[in-house]
């Protein structure tokens, strides 16, 4: 059975990630794998005891799936991605502390690198997210880049799992009629795809007066969205593994879960 993998470090954010991961894994009918990446000097015994204690506390929530854990040593991003390959993970979920958390570098170092290096989509969850409600509305921004639509099958999969409504947000980054026409065409194609797939959705196009991130987040606020789906390849740097400004800003500023998808990842959780 395929697996949903969760990066775990005993933080509030990672505990929330486990909660949502259990829900997602139950709906996908995939096993759940928790991964703790320790430093060289950490004693594994108390780590193992605490993970087993916490797992026992949520075991009753599992619906026909298994939950296991593994303790690895090394760099967080490398070990998470390696474990994802080892257990045929279709999705990685990580909790983040955000810019106000006790470990500011987590969002800048471990999360960014995990997303950039991962072969599967990565769902990041902030510890200030409201987990009392389901994923009712999911925002899918569409720009004029050639691969912007490739995140739609993954978003549609989540929408069907949670009976969510997709909000397709066309982003006009220019007054140029050709560029706006490309966005309109892509939104129309997505609309047709989702109609055939019988996925609830609405389509909206807006101007981008500031930047893509701010406009997307303002729209997400206006519809009380529960998740945002972005592509990472189109924003990635050509000279390094680091994500581009749009993805970095979205991951840092969004208090909602962000699902980051690369073009070659569309066949994983969208199956």
Please tell me what each predicted stretch does:
Residues 22, 56, 112, 156, ...:
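Active-site phosphate/pyrophosphate- and oxyanion-stabilizing loops and adjacent acidic/basic residues
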Residues 66-69, 203-205:
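Rossmann-fold cofactor-recognition segment
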Residues 14, 73, 104, 148, ...:
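A conditional alpha-helix N-cap/helix-loop micro-motif detector
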Residues 81-130, 221-271:
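Gly/Ser-rich helix-loop-strand patches that form or flank binding pockets
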Residues 45, 105, 135, 151, ...:
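Short, well-ordered secondary-structure micro-motifs
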Residues 1-47, 137-186, 191-205, 222-227, ...:
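Small/aliphatic-rich secondary-structure junction motif
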Residues 58-65, 194-199:
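Short helix-capping segments at alpha-helix termini
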